[in-house]
């Protein structure tokens, strides 16, 4: 396996596990991961939220940790990266309004580079217009957005993931083992 440069686009109130776990896991196997957020610099941090599934009609939300950013968003050239990771949580709700973020997402699809999105990360994919004809899993409340963007919503178990071409998606953090394994396969192709 050759080490890859992976970009993680995140923001305030990203889901704690969905940022921290892949960030650390991908580095643990030798990849370089740069975590960025618009209007923030390397050394800044984003607030995270812990989403849990406790038997209510939707997930619960609790304060998470501070997640340190490792690169400056304004300095990023997506051409210098081999893959993209988009954690879920609240951040994709507002990141999808940022034209520079959408342009970065589009770069990875235009160049057929591996992309992973978890949970509400599908909102960013839908806004970028990259889901047409693709299977995409996400938190179930994102199904209308996936379908309105021309994607095929993959209604899978919360512990599963789906790969369609260069895209790996999962409904939420319980699917980390599944989506990380599928993403690693794409990284090694």
Feature names for model-found ranges:
Residues 1-111, 124-135, 143-189:
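Extended, subdomain-level signal for the structured scaffold at the beginning of enzyme domains
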Residues 118-121:
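Short, thiol/selenol-centered motifs that function as redox-active sites or metal-ligating centers
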């Amino acid at each position: 396996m050759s080490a890859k440069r992976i970009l993680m686009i995140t923001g305030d109130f990203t889901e704690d596990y969905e940022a921290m776990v892949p960030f650390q896991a991908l580095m643990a196997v030798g990849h370089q991961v740069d975590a960025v957020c618009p209007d923030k610099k390397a050394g800044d941090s984003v607030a995270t939220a812990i989403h849990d599934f406790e038997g209510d009609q939707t997930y619960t939300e609790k304060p998470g940790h501070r997640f340190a950013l490792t690169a400056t968003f304004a300095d990023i050239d997506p051409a210098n990266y081999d893959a993209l990771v988009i954690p879920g949580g609240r951040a994709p709700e507002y990141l999808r309004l940022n034209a520079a973020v959408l342009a970065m997402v589009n770069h990875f699809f235009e160049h057929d580079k591996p992309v992973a999105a978890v949970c509400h990360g599908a909102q960013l994919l839908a806004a970028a217009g990259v889901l047409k004809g693709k299977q995409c899993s996400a938190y179930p409340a994102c199904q209308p957005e996936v379908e309105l963007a021309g994607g095929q919503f993959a209604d899978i178990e919360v512990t599963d993931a789906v790969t369609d071409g260069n895209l790996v998606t999962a409904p939420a953090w319980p699917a980390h083992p599944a989506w990380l394994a599928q993403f690693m396969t794409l990284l090694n192709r």
